Amino acid sequence: MAKNPPENCEDCHILNAEAFKSKKICKSLKICGLVFGILALTLIVLFWGSKHFWPEVPKKAYDMEHTFYSNGEKKKIYMEIDPVTRTEIFRSGNGTDETLEVHDFKNGYTGIYFVGLQKCFIKTQIKVIPEFSEPEEEIDENEEITTTFFEQSVIWVPAEKPIENRDFLKNSKILEICDNVTMYWINPTLISVSELQDFEEEGEDLHFPANEKKGIEQNEQWVVPQVKVEKTRHARQASEEELPINDYTENGIEFDPMLDERGYCCIYCRRGNRYCRRVCEPLLGYYPYPYCYQGGRVICRVIMPCNWWVARMLGRV
C-alpha cells in the first residue's frame, strides 16, 4: 500500500507533461496560422493596390488613320503611337512622295524623313510639359523687349552642313529610320510682319520649296489660330534693321550655332522673341501617350538674343 502514492505521482507528472506539450503545440499552430493569415492578407492588399494604382504600361502600339482634303485632293495620314518608347510616327503619301514624321518625346527630338529626297531633317522639341501657372505680374503688351511669334509665322530652314555626330540619336527611333540618309538640323526663321500682311491682304502665296510646302500642309491641323500683330511695333522694328548687331566678335567672342539650334538663345535677333506653339499632352496620365486632347495647350517661351546674355553677364543690362 505504501508504494501506490509514488506510482500515482509519476502518472500525474506524465499526464501534466503531455497536457503541457499539447498546449504548446496548439499555441504554436495558432501563431503560425496568424502569421500565414497576415501574410496572405498583405499579399492580397499589395496585389489589389498594384492593379488599381500602378499604371500598367501597354506593350502594343496603337494605329490610327486620318483622312483629310488638301487642295481638293483626298489624302490619308497614318499615325502610330508606341507608349513604351514614347514615340509618335506620322506617315503620309506613297512612293517618292512618302513622308515620315517621328516625334521622340523620350529624347526630345522630331525627325522628318522625305523618301524622295533621301534626307532627314531634325529639330528639337520639349520632353517634359511644363507646369502652367498664372504670372504673378502682368506683362505690359507695349514692352519693347519681346514680340510674340506663333507657329504660322515661322518657317523651318535646313542648315547648310549635314549632321556628322549622331550620338545624340543613339537610342532614338529617328536613327532607325534616318540611319542611311543625310541628316540636317532645321532652324526656325521668322516671317516679317509685312510679309504676313501681304499674304493676308493681297492673297499672294509665299514661295516655299516643294518639300517644305508639303510639310506645312501636313501640319495644318496643329497650327495655332491666326492672331493680329500690332503695326506700331513693326515700325520700330524697321528702324532697328538699319543698326548693326553687336555680336561681340571684335572682342574675340564667337557663339556656338548649337545655342541657336537648341533654342537657348538667338544669335541674329535684335530683341527677345516670344515663341508659342501647341503641345499635346496626356489626359490625367492615361495611355496612349501622348495624344492631343482638345487641340492641345498653348505654351510660350521667351528666347533672348545671345548678345543680350553676354551684356547681362558683363553688367551692362
Curated annotation (Swiss-Prot):
Residues 93-186 form the BRICHOS domain. SMART domains: BRICHOS. GO terms for cellular component: cytoplasm; membrane; nuclear envelope. Residues 1-30 are cytoplasmic. Highly expressed in hypovascular connective tissues such as tendons. Also has strong expression in adipose tissue. Keywords: Cytoplasm, Disulfide bond, Glycoprotein, Membrane, Nucleus, Phosphoprotein, Signal-anchor, Transmembrane, Transmembrane helix. One of its GO terms (biological process) is negative regulation of angiogenesis. InterPro entries: BRICHOS_dom (IPR007084), Chondromodulin/Tenomodulin (IPR043405). The modification Phosphoserine is found at residue 239. Disulfide bonds join 120-178. Glycans are attached at residues 94, 180. PANTHER family: CHONDROMODULIN-RELATED (PTHR14064), TENOMODULIN (PTHR14064:SF3). Belongs to the chondromodulin-1 family. This is Tenomodulin. It comes from Homo sapiens.
